[in-house]
Amino acid sequence: MKHLLKLLNPSLLLPIVSLLLVSASCKKDDPTPPTPHNDEEVITTFQFKITDSASNATTTYFFKDPDGDGGQSPFYGPTASTQSDSVLQLQNNRTYFVQVILMDETKSPATITSDEVNAEGQDHMLFYNNGSTTIISASNPYTVKLNGSDMVIKYTDLDSGSPQRGIGLTTRWRTYTTGKYPLNITLRHQPGVKDGTYAPGDSDISVNFKYQIN
């Protein structure tokens, strides 16, 4: 490099040095590509924990699709891994505290996906429906009535949005009419469009149970 600099006209060195400095500056200032963020929740297990407010007894029911999009067949519980459906057993004129736990069991240890849903509650909402559902209150606490059984479901959690809205991971159920009824629970992913209604966004998971009020 010393010999090269001697041969060059000094008047030519300044543009060359400037070019080298600009090139180095551009390399230094080149932004690092951002790491892609995966917003899709992986859910292989939907679990209900139902606590009778009178007896304080808790019963767990679940739906599992062990390998997600793989070839294993999904199943219900709690009694056996071969159940084709699950019936939630409830007593009439009772109040129940209900918690939904969502998991990704393709990982070891399993990931509690409902923790992520709760943390991003302003983008998520669980909807409970039996084919004919009436919204009793769209404000807090968000409350619906499942027509036919007249069971009332009141949301007991709130997101961090403004205004705050229910998420549906924890709810309080009140039973009124005996019989056996269908129940669909759908988790809607509604980033930036959550308004307390089902329509906006996409479904992360939708599971069908039945409930028996005795």
Whereabouts are the PLM-identified features?
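Short acidic/polar inter-strand loop motif in beta-rich domains
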Residues: 104-112, 190-196
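Exposed beta-sheet edge/beta-hairpin loop segments within beta-rich domains
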Residues: 86-94, 153-183, 190-202
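N-terminal edge beta-strand
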Residues: 63-90
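Extended, polar beta-sheet/loop recognition surfaces of beta-rich domains
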Residues: 29-31, 35-41, 106-163
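Bacterial Sec-dependent N-terminal signal peptides
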Residues: 1-5, 18-48
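A composition-driven surface/loop motif
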Residues: 41-59, 177-183, 187-191
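Short beta-strand elements
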Residues: 199-214
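Gly/Thr-rich phosphate-binding loop signature of adenosyl cofactor/nucleotide-binding cores
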Residues: 100
